[in-house]
């Protein structure tokens, strides 16, 4: 999952 928070 892309984003500032890792999956």
Swiss-Prot record:
Q: Which GO terms describe its cellular component?
A: extracellular region
GO molecular function (one)? toxin activity
Coarse class of the primary localization is secreted
Entry comment describing in which tissues the protein is expressed: Expressed by the venom gland.
Q: Which residues carry this modification: Pyrrolidone carboxylic acid?
A: 1
Localization, UniProt:
Secreted
Q: Which UniProt keywords apply?
A: G-protein coupled acetylcholine receptor impairing toxin, G-protein coupled receptor impairing toxin, Hypotensive agent, Pyrrolidone carboxylic acid, Secreted, Toxin
Has keyword Secreted? yes
Domain of life of the native organism: Eukaryota
| A GO BP entry | regulation of blood pressure
Q: Recite the other comments.
A: Negative results: weakly inhibits angiotensin-converting enzyme (ACE) with no clear preference for either C- or N-domains. It does not potentiate bradykinin, and does not affect angiotensin-1 pressor effects. It does not bind to type-1 angiotensin-2 receptor (AGTR1). It does not bind to the muscarinic acetylcholine receptor M3 (CHRM3).
**What is the purpose of this protein?**
This peptide shows potent and long-lasting antihypertensive activity as well as a reduction of the heart rate. These effects may be explained by the agonistic activities of this peptide for the muscarinic acetylcholine receptor M1 (CHRM1) (EC(50)=0.25-0.31 uM), since these types of G-protein coupled receptor have been demonstrated to be active in the blood pressure control.
Entry's family note: Belongs to the bradykinin-potentiating peptide family.
Q: Identify this protein by name.
A: Bradykinin-potentiating peptide 7a
Q: Which organism is it from?
A: Bothrops jararaca (Jararaca)
């Amino acid at each position: 999952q892309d984003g500032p928070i890792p999956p």
